[in-house]
Amino acid sequence: MERGPTVGAGLGAGTRVRALLGCLVKVLLWVASALLYFGSEQAARLLGSPCLRRLYHAWLAAVVIFGPLLQFHVNSRTIFASHGNFFNIKFVNSAWGWTCTFLGGFVLLVVFLATRRVAVTARHLSRLVVGAAVWRGAGRAFLLIEDLTGSCFEPLPQGLLLHELPDRKSCLAAGHQWRGYTVSSHTFLLTFCCLLMAEEAAVFAKYLAHGLPAGAPLRLVFLLNVLLLGLWNFLLLCTVIYFHQYTHKVVGAAVGTFAWYLTYGSWYHQPWSPGIPGHGLFPRSRSMRKHN
């Protein structure tokens, strides 16, 4: 007889708690959606600015040229000074894989949502295939340079003993060290990835301006690419501060910039190429049609 009101009050309290939690979840989802929308809009506007993109090239050059001077003002025992640090192993050594995964998803969504054409989507994704070929070709070229300029040494307590072994393979097989001119492949790859990602992500501003579908998944993928681009900039700075010789880093960055210029700055503007980012995605304005 006395338990009825108690049970009813308990059920009422439970209902109110569930309703309160439901409202809280809705508010949190609304806030997350608003932040996602605002963040993607601002990042797209920033990366889509031609002036800021030119300044970005100057920023990368300054990082590589003047960044090594910071080694005299930073703690040499920090985690980023170790070759075995988490970021170096998990991200820098696999930078192209991370870039292809994140950027490939972004290009796939942007191109397909804008055109609904598989052939056009495949053409734009082929830029990543070209990038992979550039990365592989550059890596082999760097190894060839090291082979052609190197000599075989045996470490001794008194110093180094020079051996007349003909190539690096036989030198390493004998347990010795091969020392040649080593272009920084990490500096090359990070520079190339930074320029490539900035170029590809810049198209999102124009995509939004044309009112094309831009739901939460696409905006989230875009922001993940922006975060990865920021990480590459940070790790490039760490690389030039803590690792490699100065000229090795400068040459690596110069080759990465030259590779970007040959592809995005030159070849992709030709009709027989994969095309520049955004090519064929957006309807031409009436004024352009009248002008033509």
UniProtKB/Swiss-Prot annotation:
Membrane-protein topology: Multi-pass membrane protein
Major place of residence: endoplasmic reticulum
Gene disruption: observed consequences: Knockout mice show no significant differences in heart size or function.
Keyword Nucleotide-binding in annotation: no
One GO MF term: coenzyme A diphosphatase activity
Lumenal domain ranges by topology: 1-18, 76-94, 163-187, 242-249
A GO BP annotation: phospholipid biosynthetic process
Keywords of this entry: Endoplasmic reticulum, Lipid metabolism, Membrane, Transmembrane, Transmembrane helix
GO cellular component: endoplasmic reticulum membrane
Active site positions, chain numbering: 186, 244
Lineage: superkingdom: Eukaryota
Keyword Membrane: yes
Cytoplasmic topological intervals: 40-54, 116-141, 209-220, 271-292
Site positions for Important for catalytic activity: 248
Tissue expression as described in the entry: Predominantly expressed in skeletal muscle and at lower levels in the heart (at protein level). In the heart, mRNA expression levels do not correlate well with protein levels, suggesting post-transcriptional regulation in this organ.
Role description: Plays an important role in the formation of lipid droplets (LDs) which are storage organelles at the center of lipid and energy homeostasis. Directly binds to diacylglycerol (DAGs) and triacylglycerol.
PANTHER family: ACYL-COENZYME A DIPHOSPHATASE FITM2, FAT STORAGE-INDUCING TRANSMEMBRANE PROTEIN 1
Family, as annotated: Belongs to the FIT family. FIT1 subfamily.
Protein name in UniProt: Fat storage-inducing transmembrane protein 1
Organism of derivation: Mus musculus (Mouse)
Taxonomic placement: Eukaryota, Metazoa, Chordata, Craniata, Vertebrata
